């Protein structure tokens, strides 16, 4: 039997131009950083930025207030407040919408006005405001106010045939002005303050621990269930408020 001379492994590697690494080392693969494209209105990419490391990361407000002015393209007939913010109607503002927020949160505040409905797009629960978000607008007064959660709506110098207010949660509404018909429906611990709103007639419904202060001149009716309270001024001639539980109505 013939004997073959084996070339050393290093000689073979040199012969074929191979590069060997130690067997006990694991090859290291460097992953490229993920990117995301930020789209402007209309779909054009405006910048490329790294994806945040975690969706649970908090965005903390800077404490520096900034304002943004938007055109009021149509009258606001209804306000849907389901985001933690304050909505203020003030006719002296004119035909525009003014958004106030922390300067580093301003671009997260998305105002929507479609078919007369004004609202804010949902925001991340991890966002921490230092400057309360405030939406102020003018033009015609809204006729429907719908609040969910802890939002607040302020209406100044209301003038209209009817004002409808619905509060679900711990939100608050503050109104002054005058109206023929006032309709209020509260479920939860919300509050309606209308001591400076002169209403000729009012229909009230409270379920839970909500509170109402209203001024009614002619007629007030409705029902109170739970532990809520209603204070009525204006000395209405017709009083048809009924209550169950510990709820009470007080006339001043």
Pin down the residues of each PLM region.
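Intrinsically disordered, low-complexity terminal regions
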Residues: 2-252
């Amino acid at each position: 039997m013939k004997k073959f001379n084996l070339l050393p492994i290093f000689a073979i590697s040199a012969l074929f131009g191979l590069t060997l690494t130690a067997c006990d080392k694991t090859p290291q693969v460097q992953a490229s950083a993920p990117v995301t494209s930020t789209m402007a209105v209309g779909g054009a990419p405006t910048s490329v930025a790294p994806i945040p490391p975690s969706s649970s990361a908090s965005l903390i407000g800077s404490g520096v207030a900034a304002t943004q002015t938007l055109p009021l393209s149509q009258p606001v007939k209804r306000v849907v407040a389901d985001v933690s913010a304050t909505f203020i109607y003030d006719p002296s503002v004119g035909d525009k919408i003014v958004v106030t927020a922390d300067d580093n949160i301003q671009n997260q505040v998305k105002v929507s006005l479609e078919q007369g409905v004004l609202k804010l797009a949902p925001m991340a629960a991890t966002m921490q405001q230092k400057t309360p978000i405030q939406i102020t607008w003018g033009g015609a007064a809204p006729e429907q106010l719908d609040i969910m959660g802890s939002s607040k709506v302020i209406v100044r110098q209301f003038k209209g045939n009817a004002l409808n207010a619905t509060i679900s949660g711990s939100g608050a509404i503050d109104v002054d002005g005058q109206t023929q018909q006032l309709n209020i429906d509260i479920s939860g611990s919300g509050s309606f303050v209308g001591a400076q709103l002169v209403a000729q007639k009012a229909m009230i419904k409270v379920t839970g621990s909500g509170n109402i202060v209203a001024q009614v001149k002619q007629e007030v009716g409705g029902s109170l269930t739970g532990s809520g309270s209603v204070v009525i001024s204006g000395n209405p001639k017709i009083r048809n408020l009924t209550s169950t539980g510990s709820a009470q109505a007080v006339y001043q």
